[in-house]
Structure formats: C-alpha cells, structure tokens
Amino acid sequence: MTIMSDKWIREQATKNGMIEPFVEAQRRDGCISYGLSSYGYDARVAPEFKIFTNVDSATVDPKDFASNSFVDRETDVCIIPPNSFALARTVEYFRVPRDVLVICLGKSTYARCGIIVNVTPLEPGWEGHVTLEFSNTTPLPAKIYANEGACQFLFLQGNEPCEISYADRAGKYMGQQGVTLPRL
C-alpha cells in the first residue's frame, strides 16, 4: 500500500468529492490545525457531542446500547469529565475510493494533554461523517474545541480495487450522518 500525497488528496477532494467541505491548506491561526497536510488531511470536530455519564447507573453494552449512557450537547467547547469519554463527528463528509483504505491518528496537541482520539479504519467504498471517539485519560476535566482540528486521516492506496467494498456489502455505518451510536 502506498500513502497518498497532498496532490492526490486535493485532486480526489476537488474532482470526486472525497472530502466535503475541503480545506485546501492547513489552517493554524490561533486554533488546533486542520486542513490538507503533506500526506494527510486534518479533519475538524463538529459542535455535536455525546458525553458519557453515569447518572442513571447504566452499563455500556455494545450489543444493547442504552441512550441514557450519555448526554447530548451542541457547543463550541465540549468538556469531558475526568477519566471519561465522548463521541463526536467530523465536520467533513468522506467518500472513500474503492482502492483506498483510510486510517486515522490523533493530533499531538490533544495527545499531549491526555486526550486520545480513536477512529476505526474507513474502508474502501464507505462514505459518511466519521464518528470520533475522545477519551480523557486524565484526572481533570478536558476541553475539545469544535470546528478545530481533531485528528489526521492518512490515505493508503492498494495495488488494485477490492473485490467487495463496504458499499457492496451494505455496511451498517454506510452513509452515516451526525454522531452515530453502535449498531449490530
């Protein structure tokens, strides 16, 4: 697999709608950086959050996810409680080409503050807003800034298109919009 350059990412985003909205140059003016980088794209977090809480003594079960496990917030600054977790989504909508696998890494700005961003790979043929998982590993409240950089996506091109894409098998998260909870 080959990691794809800024030139390729720009072309796919502008001609094929791979990333919408697309920010062509990295923005760093007084914010956590986002936009096109040399070999990746730094995506922004939207102002839509689901913050985990234990007010109702719920148990987190991926097979039977209880909606009372979290509170919804629309805000420019999300505060994640100590040793807690929040879900969010990217501002950008992604359309992954059939011969590409996308992996995501957290931003060092957040990592150096004990905030871990996790995203599973974006499979060939998948499209949607990416649900972001933020873990606050510290004993202190932690801030996440909406409309600023959250993570970096790296685009890996395979040696040929896959036989069966995520779209072909009608994957359960295909076309997701907004923060998407676990599905079976």
From Swiss-Prot:
Amino acids binding dCTP: 107-112, 131-133, 152, 166, 176
Keyword Oxidoreductase assigned: no
Enzyme Commission number(s): 3.5.4.13
Any single Pfam family the record assigns to this protein: DCD
Entry keyword Transport: no
Active site (catalytic residues): 133
Gene3D superfamilies in alphabetical order: 2.70.40.10
Assigned keywords, A-Z: Hydrolase, Nucleotide metabolism, Nucleotide-binding
Catalytic activities: dCTP + H2O + H(+) = dUTP + NH4(+)
GO biological process, one term: dUTP biosynthetic process
Biological or metabolic pathway of the protein: Pyrimidine metabolism; dUMP biosynthesis; dUMP from dCTP (dUTP route): step 1/2
Signal peptide: none
GO molecular function, one term: nucleotide binding
NCBIfam families documented for this protein: dCTP_deam
Family membership: Belongs to the dCTP deaminase family.
Quaternary structure annotation from Swiss-Prot or TrEMBL: Homotrimer.
Function: Catalyzes the deamination of dCTP to dUTP.
HAMAP family reported for this sequence: dCTP_deaminase
Protein's name according to its UniProt entry: dCTP deaminase
Organism the protein comes from: Rhizorhabdus wittichii (strain DSM 6014 / CCUG 31198 / JCM 15750 / NBRC 105917 / EY 4224 / RW1) (Sphingomonas wittichii)
